[in-house]
């Protein structure tokens, strides 16, 4: 008898809309391959009842808090249900951009220069301290919450007068923030399937930066796969992405985002343990370049579940 698979989608995070799209796409891909897959919106159905409902395996298509931060993974471990993607520790760590960066720095991987600020500090931040950050990092800057994905809560800061407002906007989403140097150069992403880096993708948003709308709704964002890198640079990027992915304990599948500066050097941004699987998403694009259809991709991800 075929395994009954739950495709977890929707949920309650800031990325609910995207998760619904990802989940429906995954569901269609699994069913195309003859898999007995069913949609489960965790907003309406208690995850603790999955086993009682006869499910034997879980495909996680949730994004953001409660879905890719280790919380859900811990529940599924307790229920002894195999699930896709990274485990508890890697999911929790990867969701936290600040602590992920600290791990990468600790093993000598390159990250974009940054300072971290928490909500207790911000009330005491003087204008002179803000000026110090700007002096250290230069303008423009990018301000982002540590614990949100899909560019939620991010703001580009072009003038020092905009910095305090950007911090306040980001604090609506998290108590820890990153203020990063703005890197002038292309953004790349590397999808990882098992222990293999798929062909890199170069991202060219029409807007100022690759924000939530550019990722999921814009028809003007351009993606290049192959990315146009030389064979040597492609290999260098693949090795960096794999090392970054494995160093925080990721497994199954994921995606590593990287910037290149004007000198051609790569800087790690973040790792995503439950990437989007919508029509605009990047992992399916990289998989196509590697010869995998969408249905073959989701079946492979499911096979890697443990």
Curated annotation (Swiss-Prot):
Binds 2 magnesium or manganese ions per subunit. Mg(2+) 2 binds at residues 270, 272. Its cofactor is Mg(2+); Mn(2+). GO terms for molecular function: ATP binding; D-alanine-D-alanine ligase activity; metal ion binding. The keyword NAD does not apply. Its EC number is 6.3.2.4. The keyword Cell wall biogenesis/degradation applies. Keywords: ATP-binding, Cell shape, Cell wall biogenesis/degradation, Cytoplasm, Ligase, Magnesium, Manganese, Metal-binding, Nucleotide-binding, Peptidoglycan synthesis. GO terms for biological process: cell wall organization; peptidoglycan biosynthetic process; regulation of cell shape. PANTHER family: D-ALANINE--D-ALANINE LIGASE, D-ALANINE--D-ALANINE LIGASE B. This is D-alanine--D-alanine ligase. The lineage of its organism: Bacteria, Pseudomonadati, Pseudomonadota, Gammaproteobacteria, Enterobacterales.
